[in-house]
Amino acid sequence: MSGRADSIDFKTANLCDEFEQSVGVAEPLLRDYGGNTSFYGSLATVKVFEDNVLVREALETDGQGRVLVVDGGGSTRCALVGDRLAQLAYENGWTGIVVDGCIRDSEEISRLSIGVKARHAVPKKSAKRGAGERDVPVRFAGLTFTPGDYLYADPDGIIVAERDLLA
């Protein structure tokens, strides 16, 4: 089961305490930008570099309460998500977007009821080449994010587990 953060109350600190041996804890590299700072769901992945075509393609699908994890290689030269993609994600039922890279339109994104975590905000848009991979394991912040695993995020950080800890 996945869902919007307002449907189930959780704290990553409590989940870490209760499931210490079965969760991975991300290094604190990302900050909150979205209107929801607590979100969770089964995760899907995209691996790209300074190109957000595959990010858009993923967010155009039915999110079904999932979280999109974007491995952008940590680039700070351009944004992989802006307000239109964040709005699209919200409308299509995604609960959150986690970006190892940058976003833009941060003020607008902060008003949307979706979780968004990223390294930084930068005004420059990305290229549109369509290069990259979808639904593959990606690694950043000291963790491997595998499609189908569960991601839990709140102001304390991000944790990942192989199963739904809230079921």
Model regions and ranges:
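Feature captures the catalytic cores and cofactor-binding loops of soluble hydro-lyases/lyases
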Residues: S2-P147, D164-A167
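A generic "binding-loop/recognition-motif" signal
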Residues: L85, D156-G157
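Short, charged beta-turn/beta-strand-edge "cap" motif at the junction between a beta-strand
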Residues: T144, G157-I159
